[in-house]
């Protein structure tokens, strides 16, 4: 078996140590390690993290391969330091059967760049009317444990209750896209001062908050797990905080873009800033950062949403919603959370690896960097600063809101079970 010696890495941001990989596992962590014939990677004080886990990725295959494929999406994931991603169900056909989730899972196995765990749809066709084959998807080769109609809300309270009851049997989780559809008809951006000035249809915070309030109460009533996708408002934070104080089994995520960007950017009418849920206010951004720091929000998830050029290069009203994020997520988290002192690197590992792996039951991921553990690792040059150039993305799509923006940090190496998928910033 091949061996790799990572020399002088700051494990979770601590003091420099050596990490020896033997085959698929970490053999040793310490100082002055040596191994005959090992490939040596001089970390020179770079930060070593467990491989990142994304609980919310859109890989688009099957059906929208013009936006992304499992292969290109997992290459983007490896470039961003991810070793495991959860693929949302809003594909064509929808991932609402054992056959479709197994197809996505097998495509991930074949890619070799990143493990792919499919997310199953809650309802047939994402139509919100009838439960999908939750049990069959769980029992399939893909072993689905997370279910979501993301892109749409499970708006019917009876359907949501039944889904929570069903997944409780195997400790699954329903990941809710919190958006009350009647309150967001014709919505184009956050409802507030900017939407009023621009004359664009407003997307009120209560459309998100009302669904979260309902669903945490349903989860309490059923005694099941619920996960809230992409929190975007200060009010949503308060509801989740209240629910956790009652002992309700709720977890929540925030995207990197909601930690950094505000609705003021929509004044440019650049559709790259059009996203669901919409960019909110500075007050919301600060509340989300604080909630991620204090643990009210459990994890960072990218909501990587690739779109072809023609779906974004058009007038605002006609543009698709969504941003790519796998290749910039860690840099945005460093800028908003680490460089501001809100989180240390151990906190980043917790929010971007340990906890998402736990929520999604991702076996072998989100593990400590210690002897005997799977060698799923990410090496980060935290001292680096550079401009984002989407021309260099591994993703098939380029719809990033950060083009030309200077961000800190760069992933230099990623290892998936001991195999280097990224070396010196280049995919293998």
From Swiss-Prot:
Zn(2+) 1 binds at residues 56, 58, 150, 303. Substrate binds at residues 58-60, 90, 276, 307. Binds 2 Zn(2+) ions per subunit. Its EC number is 3.5.2.3. Keywords: Hydrolase, Metal-binding, Pyrimidine biosynthesis, Zinc. The keyword Protein biosynthesis does not apply. Gene3D superfamilies: Metal-dependent hydrolases, Urease, subunit C, domain 1. GO terms for biological process: 'de novo' UMP biosynthetic process; purine nucleobase catabolic process. Zn(2+) 2 binds at residues 150, 177, 230. The active site is at 303. InterPro entries: Amidohydro-rel, DHOase, DHOase/Allantoinase_Hydrolase, Dihydroorotase_CS, Metal-dep_hydrolase_composite, Metal_Hydrolase. GO terms for molecular function: allantoinase activity; dihydroorotase activity; zinc ion binding. It is an enzyme of class 3 (hydrolase). The keyword Metal-binding applies. It catalyses: (S)-dihydroorotate + H2O = N-carbamoyl-L-aspartate + H(+). Pathway: Pyrimidine metabolism; UMP biosynthesis via de novo pathway; (S)-dihydroorotate from bicarbonate: step 3/3. It holds the Pfam family Amidohydro_1. Belongs to the metallo-dependent hydrolases superfamily. DHOase family. Class I DHOase subfamily. Catalyzes the reversible cyclization of carbamoyl aspartate to dihydroorotate. This is Dihydroorotase.
